[in-house]
Amino acid sequence: MTSSVSRPSGRRADELRKVALTRHYTKHAEGSVLVEFGDTKVLCTASVAERVPEFLRERGQGWLTAEYGMLPRATHTRSDREAARGKQTGRTQEIQRLIGRALRAVFDLEALGPRTIHIDCDVIQADGGTRTASITGAFVAAHDAVSTLIAAGKLARSPITDHVAAISVGVYEGAPVLDLDYAEDSRCDTDMNVVMTGAGGFVEVQGTAEGVPFSRAEMNALLDLAQGGIAELVQLQKDVLGASHA
């Protein structure tokens, strides 16, 4: 069923877009990555602060939190900056919480110590899958921030317990497909975002039927596609981290 679908990009049903992770993209942050999924481009930075939120004071553990935003012309038409409106949208809040949860799932916060890693994901160009690209790139940025702490003698070992990556899947023209771009996302019957660890554990599954309910068989097929795609993304993370892999 998945092999016969005709996708706007010409990709196979189980084929990722071209994915690139460019490390050390900016010079000031402890970790920075430009992540590209086809025409979707997100700048992910990881910054370290030697303090924790008030609710973690005297607990002897660290924290990791995330913020997400889109540049005004990241999409086809310009959007006002949320700062100019004075309020974040519900979508923005949902996505940045998802990014934070995803990364905390693979961090030993006690081993991080009483400090905070701030993840910032800024969408430069959007063509579908910005939240999943953000998670995949943010992990590499966080890894580099941890490496900076180890090199400075502030950490004896890495608090990272596993890799984490994310991908979108959906039912497009009746067939399950991997890594939806905007042309597919805007027309799909089902849209699902899946976050998994390198060991194959599920961190989060967000699935919505866009008018046409999906079956259990379709859900299983989508999860299988996502698992295969995330395995590819984790391998790419390992490849780009190379010798510095924790």
Curated annotation (Swiss-Prot):
<comment type="subunit">
    <text>Homohexameric ring arranged as a trimer of dimers.</text>
</comment>
<comment type="function">
    <text>Phosphorolytic 3'-5' exoribonuclease that plays an important role in tRNA 3'-end maturation. Removes nucleotide residues following the 3'-CCA terminus of tRNAs; can also add nucleotides to the ends of RNA molecules by using nucleoside diphosphates as substrates, but this may not be physiologically important. Probably plays a role in initiation of 16S rRNA degradation (leading to ribosome degradation) during starvation.</text>
</comment>
<dbReference type="GO" id="GO:0006364">
    <property type="term" value="P:rRNA processing"/>
</dbReference>
<dbReference type="InterPro" id="IPR050080">
    <property type="entry name" value="RNase_PH"/>
</dbReference>
<dbReference type="GO" id="GO:0016075">
    <property type="term" value="P:rRNA catabolic process"/>
</dbReference>
<dbReference type="InterPro" id="IPR036345">
    <property type="entry name" value="ExoRNase_PH_dom2_sf"/>
</dbReference>
<keyword id="KW-0820">tRNA-binding</keyword>
<dbReference type="InterPro" id="IPR002381">
    <property type="entry name" value="RNase_PH_bac-type"/>
</dbReference>
<dbReference type="InterPro" id="IPR027408">
    <property type="entry name" value="PNPase/RNase_PH_dom_sf"/>
</dbReference>
<dbReference type="GO" id="GO:0000049">
    <property type="term" value="F:tRNA binding"/>
</dbReference>
<dbReference type="Pfam" id="PF03725">
    <property type="entry name" value="RNase_PH_C"/>
</dbReference>
<comment type="similarity">
    <text>Belongs to the RNase PH family.</text>
</comment>
<protein>
    <recommendedName>
        <fullName>Ribonuclease PH</fullName>
        <ecNumber>2.7.7.56</ecNumber>
    </recommendedName>
</protein>
<keyword id="KW-0548">Nucleotidyltransferase</keyword>
<dbReference type="InterPro" id="IPR001247">
    <property type="entry name" value="ExoRNase_PH_dom1"/>
</dbReference>
<keyword id="KW-0694">RNA-binding</keyword>
<dbReference type="InterPro" id="IPR020568">
    <property type="entry name" value="Ribosomal_Su5_D2-typ_SF"/>
</dbReference>
<dbReference type="Pfam" id="PF01138">
    <property type="entry name" value="RNase_PH"/>
</dbReference>
<dbReference type="GO" id="GO:0009022">
    <property type="term" value="F:tRNA nucleotidyltransferase activity"/>
</dbReference>
<dbReference type="GO" id="GO:0008033">
    <property type="term" value="P:tRNA processing"/>
</dbReference>
<feature type="binding site">
    <location>
        <begin position="129"/>
        <end position="131"/>
    </location>
    <ligand>
        <name>phosphate</name>
    </ligand>
</feature>
<dbReference type="GO" id="GO:0000175">
    <property type="term" value="F:3'-5'-RNA exonuclease activity"/>
</dbReference>
<keyword id="KW-0819">tRNA processing</keyword>
<dbReference type="InterPro" id="IPR018336">
    <property type="entry name" value="RNase_PH_CS"/>
</dbReference>
<keyword id="KW-0808">Transferase</keyword>
<keyword id="KW-0698">rRNA processing</keyword>
<dbReference type="InterPro" id="IPR015847">
    <property type="entry name" value="ExoRNase_PH_dom2"/>
</dbReference>
<feature type="binding site">
    <location>
        <position position="91"/>
    </location>
    <ligand>
        <name>phosphate</name>
    </ligand>
</feature>
